[in-house]
Swiss-Prot record:
UniProt-recorded name of the protein: UDP-N-acetylglucosamine 1-carboxyvinyltransferase
Biological process, per Gene Ontology: cell division; cell wall organization; peptidoglycan biosynthetic process; regulation of cell shape; UDP-N-acetylgalactosamine biosynthetic process
Residues bearing the modification 2-(S-cysteinyl)pyruvic acid O-phosphothioketal: C119
UniProt gene name: murA
Binding residues annotated for UDP-N-acetyl-alpha-D-glucosamine, in chain numbering: R95, R124, P125, I126, D127, Q128, D309, V331
Record function comment: Cell wall formation. Adds enolpyruvyl to UDP-N-acetylglucosamine.
Positions annotated to bind phosphoenolpyruvate: K22, N23
Localization terms from the record: Cytoplasm
Entry similarity comment: Belongs to the EPSP synthase family. MurA subfamily.
Length: 422
């Protein structure tokens, strides 16, 4: 099993490029199931989750390949007859596999999809997906770990539905289903993440009638059919945010190219509050970590609030602050699993339910640590960069689900980091 080895305490200087957003690429690729033909999705990161979705679509009868000479382009050929099943063997490692449910129901009128897996950071049930699809006219049964769904009337029908809680994949799944439904659908209390808007843009490019994607209310007028997809996904705001935090670590000066400043407002506000210098530059943002950080209080929230996917990374910065910070996690339960590993590096963190009190220490010291989930693994890499001595991050298969060769991006900045194949 691979591990990342870091010799920490070295200042980072230079520029790093952001890959395409995994959480935008996955629903856009799933949307290809809505239309027969040849599709092209650009700016797609080469990540384990993307490869898993490619295998899943291949299992359904689609042809999926990276472009020759352009590994960031994924080309798909979707046949008229698609096998409407997502087996457990493929779905178990990736929660986003459930995104095929809406497109399959909309186009084929039936689907059998295993209940999803992914990071173990809370229950994250798909009940909102199923309630909304039922409101669109689907009949759904949960049997033997599978969602068995059908549309007795042949086509889904438009509806007005209010999500009980904001859900990104739920919003995306129902958007795709409603694109081919009969009549008008109005979705309320929708997730407002940039990835939702990106999917809306992709659906419109396919001929769908969608308005309001990226706001809390989305209007969709179903159409009889859609045309093949051609779309470039947005940059990954969480990868960009991770590099921005790296730049804010004491003594660092990092320019993150390709990030969208509007997607980083909540994070940038906190980075400036801790004392980092953040400036807009052509094509991105520059962050300078000037001295020891100041403590801040952080509360995660759905977009446009502070992203839960950046909570662990920011905690690393606050572990070095001159004072005590408070982090409140409101989005997911059980999302402080990285704390025990940070304590191994010398951090002083106490957790009480959904609140972590972070008492800053002058420095961290390297040690072997084990990743528990995707964003925790990124936090441990950041901690290893800041710590003195050697840090080994184990179970980096979590890291590879969401970061495209992170060690190769950090090394040109001066980081002494390498992957050891196991």
């Amino acid at each position: 099993m691979d591990k990342i080895v870091i010799e920490g305490g070295v200042p980072l200087r230079g520029s790093v490029d952001v890959s395409g957003a995994k959480n935008a690429a996955l629903p856009v690729i799933a949307a290809a199931l809505l239309a027969e033909g040849e599709h092209e999705v650009r700016n797609v990161p080469d990540l384990a989750d993307v490869r898993t979705l490619g295998k899943l679509l291949g299992h359904m009868g689609c042809e999926v390949a990276r472009g020759e000479g352009d590994r960031r382009t994924v080309r798909l050929r979707v046949p008229a007859a698609v096998a409407p099943e997502a087996p457990y063997e493929l779905v178990k490692t990736m929660r986003a596999s459930v995104l095929v449910l809406g497109p399959l129901l909309a186009r084929l009128g039936r689907a059998r999809v295993s209940l999803p897996g992914g990071c173990a950071i809370g229950a994250r049930p798909i009940d909102q997906h199923l309630k909304a699809l039922t409101a669109l006219g689907a009949e759904i049964r949960l049997e033997h770990g599978y969602v068995n769904a059908s549309v007795p009337r042949g086509r889904l029908r438009g509806t007005v539905f209010t999500f009980d809680a904001q859900t990104v994949t739920g919003t995306e799944n129902v958007m795709m289903a409603a694109a081919l439904a009969d009549g008008e659908t109005v979705l309320r209390n929708c997730a407002r993440e940039p990835e939702v808007k990106d999917l809306g843009d992709a659906l419109v490019a396919m001929g769908a009638l969608v308005e309001g994607a990226g706001t809390d209310e989305i209007w969709i007028e179903g159409v009889p059919s859609l045309r093949p997809l051609s779309h470039a996904v947005i940059p990954d705001r969480i990868e960009a945010g991770t590099f921005l935090v790296a730049g804010a670590l004491p003594g660092n000066d990092v320019t993150v190219r390709g990030c969208v400043a509007a997607h980083q407002e909540a994070l940038v506000e906190k980075l400036r509050a801790v004392g980092a210098e953040v400036t807009k530059v052509e094509g991105g943002l520059r962050v300078v970590g000037d001295g020891r950080p100041r403590p801040v209080d952080v509360r995660t929230a759905p977009h446009p609030g502070f992203p839960t996917d950046m909570q662990a990374q920011l905690m690393v910065l606050l572990c070095l602050a001159d004072g005590t910070s408070r982090i409140t996690e409101t989005v997911f339960e059980n999302r402080f699993m990285h704390v025990q590993e940070l304590i191994r590096l010398g951090a002083h963190v106490e957790v009480d339910g959904r609140v972590a009190m972070v008492k800053g220490v002058p420095e961290l010291s390297g040690a072997p640590v084990m990743a528990s989930d995707l964003r925790a693994s990124a936090a441990l890499v950041l901690a290893g960069l800041a710590a003195s001595g050697t840090t080994e991050v184990l179970r980096v298969y979590h890291l590879d689900r969401g970061y495209e060769r992170i060690e190769e991006k950090l090394a040109p900045l001066g980081a002494r980091i390498r992957r050891v194949r196991g």
